Amino acid sequence: MWGFRLLRSPPLLLLLPQLGIGNASSCSQARTMNPGGSGGARCSLSAEVRRRQCLQLSTVPGADPQRSNELLLLAAAGEGLERQDLPGDPAKEEPQPPPQHHVLYFPGDVQNYHEIMTRHPENYQWENWSLENVATILAHRFPNSYIWVIKCSRMHLHKFSCYDNFVKSNMFGAPEHNTDFGAFKHLYMLLVNAFNLSQNSLSKKSLNVWNKDSIASNCRSSPSHTTNGCQGEKVRTCEKSDESAMSFYPPSLNDASFTLIGFSKGCVVLNQLLFELKEAKKDKNIDAFIKSIRTMYWLDGGHSGGSNTWVTYPEVLKEFAQTGIIVHTHVTPYQVRDPMRSWIGKEHKKFVQILGDLGMQVTSQIHFTKEAPSIENHFRVHEVF
């Protein structure tokens, strides 16, 4: 059964000073990143963050009703698109929403909802990169965009993300790529169903929103749990916001454009999409969806398999080059300079080289080269890409 619930996470405040959001001087207490702790600092959030709603969509089916994923949506608000009529003014026509941009993000291993990560004996170390926190980072990176975090369908041992609905995978989520698994069909229908599900949820005056009062001033610690409050060791309840000054347009596929981002294990989804391009284009709806994809980001891709971390098949990349999609790769020494997994760096170099030779617009950047390879820097690629 489809469902949704609001998510609010105090650790979002911990990342705001690093991202340049809000008043850093007033957030000194929030700079200390302790597992599950929300600090207690009251930060002045930027207008962009205040105007966003976070919605968890559970059990959203794809092309096959038996294959579903959870999605986390951080919605963009209409900026200056709704006129507040003065008393006595004649009724005005409802403005048409502008074309929307949607960012689709596929997380890596261990990434989960903040509440789950803080309770795990090992994964709590990486709670700053929870699904909610990364959604906020992406919202800052892609302003005025709808941020969709597409959660893997299975997490082996609570660590290894497995995208079984997008690509044939082994127990630990290492992919076995082919040309007809149906990743594009699943993604397209997943979005269609998620958009429909969120239509009413994100309409005006339907939900509480993140604003300066609900996040900063009116979030109070409470020992009890609430679905409407901020999650953490101590749940913080948020009062209802002033909805009259805000306008939220529901997600729409009409004239929409897309950015696809894979991080670490999440890159296996992007790779599978490349393998399916030729066949997927035969479906007119999916072909239209492919043409609406503007950019794809590979962020430090990696998985537990012994090869195929990056796509290096010329015939597959030739088909990809014909799409005109802009490609960005951002990597760290943790992946591409690991002597025990030397194929990753070689495959990455070949991926970029072949696409460049095919005339595709592709950029490649390696980060943290002067620092020792670490998982922390692997995650920090979110901050610098």
UniProtKB/Swiss-Prot annotation:
Its main location: mitochondrion. Residues 1-24 form a transit peptide. Keywords: Electron transport, Mitochondrion, Primary mitochondrial disease, Respiratory chain, Transit peptide, Transport. GO terms for biological process: oxidative phosphorylation. InterPro entries: C2orf69_mit. It is found in: Mitochondrion matrix. The keyword Mitochondrion applies. One of its GO terms (cellular component) is mitochondrion. Belongs to the C2orf69 family. PANTHER family: MITOCHONDRIAL PROTEIN C2ORF69, UPF0565 PROTEIN C2ORF69. May play a role in the respiratory chain. It is linked to Combined oxidative phosphorylation deficiency 53: An autosomal recessive mitochondrial disorder characterized by global developmental delay, hypomyelination, cerebral atrophy, microcephaly, liver dysfunction, and recurrent autoinflammation. This is Mitochondrial protein C2orf69.
